Amino acid sequence: MNDVDIRHLQRCVELATEAVDAGDQPFGSILVSRDGTVLFEDRNRTGGGDATRHPEFAIARWSAEHLTPEERRHAVVYTSGEHCAMCAAAHGLVGLGRIVYATSTPQLSHWMQELGKPSLGITLLRIIDVVPDADVAGPVPDFAEEVRALHARAVS
């Protein structure tokens, strides 16, 4: 983990904040090319009723339409929270590269229990449970309290 990774993760947390401010769940993600160019960014948009409007899923779809397999393989996805199973599968299926996340699935699960939020009705899996050979880095402890506070805001 280096300063560039931290800067990109901070942008993801900013996008997650925008999501909460808009009534969506606190997740934000960006796609960065091999040369460091931010290619795509998005935030969660599930508040409108479509539970699949995750930023990581949007990145997978965008990259499949706009990047070559080699460009996808060398791109890095930065995200405020570790991918869910749906997004991890999409990531693996389109052949995206490294994933760097600020907070993990176990952290999210713990926070949801603490906040009294009911289960989503699905099993929360780690990225490596879905894409065993995925190149992942995270969580980053410095982001835990800020992201937990966003989840608390979203629940209230």
Q: Where do the model's predicted regions map?
A:
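Short, flexible loop/turn motifs enriched in small residues
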Residues: 22-26
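Immediate flanking context of iron-sulfur cluster ligation sites
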Residues: 69-81
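Short beta->alpha transition motifs characteristic of CBS
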Residues: 39-46
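Short beta-strand scaffold segments in enzyme catalytic cores
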Residues: 27-33
